[in-house]
Amino acid sequence: DLAMATGLTTLRHLRDNKIADKVAAQGEWLKGKLAELQKRYPVIGHVRGLGLMIGIEIVKPNEAQDHMGCYPADGELSALLQKKCFETGLILERGGRHGCVLRLLPSLLISDAELDVFLDKFEQALLAAGVKPV
């Protein structure tokens, strides 16, 4: 009974506070900010996601694109970025082809200020990994 009451209370809180709408808006904002970073750091390939569940593909932009226009995956750099992110306090998962996709899976209650901190720390990790902005 306690578990059911807790679950119901949680669902009501999510509905009453429009958490899904907030998360959708934050996700779109964050993908836009990552697109800005992508312009400065071409190792950032495709950025995709739903809400705040976002994947950041890490690629080799100096190599030839395949028949679909995609750069080769860079699993090594992705692993290094994951490590550098961890050193700044960010925990990102890896997945995708050759482990080249960094996965952002924050709490649904993350604040806008915390998303700004993420962006700053992610850029710090790029620089620490030796990625040069263009």
Residue ranges with predicted function:
Residues 1-134:
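Conserved N-terminal phosphate-binding loop of PLP-dependent enzymes in the Aspartate aminotransferase
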